[in-house]
């Protein structure tokens, strides 16, 4: 817990994930990580509104903009509002340090952590 995901930070070095410009969002996980298959993301209102208005409320453009943000930053954090959202998903893989805990692959999860600090692929 002491690193708090800092090994995923690529820009700028030495920052925590939620403050970083870019995260490593590769699919391989470390011993203390888990990979969650996204089922839904609830964007914060400012984030959602800014993306929608900049895309003229066109669904295909909104989807493309979200994909562009995650490809560029490795996480879903709007570069204009600095806001993000929370996610719902299913555990796909668990790192070895989590073995024996109260969750397993296939469990549903809702993050209490903003997607600003989570790698999104």
Locate the predicted segments by residue.
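A conserved mid-domain beta-alpha-beta active-site/ligand-binding segment of alpha/beta enzyme cores
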Residues: 10, 74, 119
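Glycine-rich beta-strand-centered segment in the early N-terminal region that forms part
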Residues: 27-42, 54-115
């Amino acid at each position: 817990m002491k690193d708090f995901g800092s090994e995923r930070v690529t820009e700028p070095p030495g920052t925590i994930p939620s403050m970083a410009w870019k995260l490593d969002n590769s699919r391989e996980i470390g011993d203390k990580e888990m990979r969650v298959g996204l089922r839904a993301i609830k964007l914060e209102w400012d984030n959602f509104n800014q993306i929608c208005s900049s895309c003229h409320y066109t669904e295909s453009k909104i989807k493309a903009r979200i994909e562009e943000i995650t490809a560029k930053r490795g996480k879903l954090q709007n570069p204009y509002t600095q806001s993000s959202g929370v996610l719902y998903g299913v555990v796909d893989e668990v790192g070895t340090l989590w073995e024996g805990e109260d969750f397993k692959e296939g469990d549903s999860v809702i993050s209490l952590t903003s997607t600003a600090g989570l790698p999104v692929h």
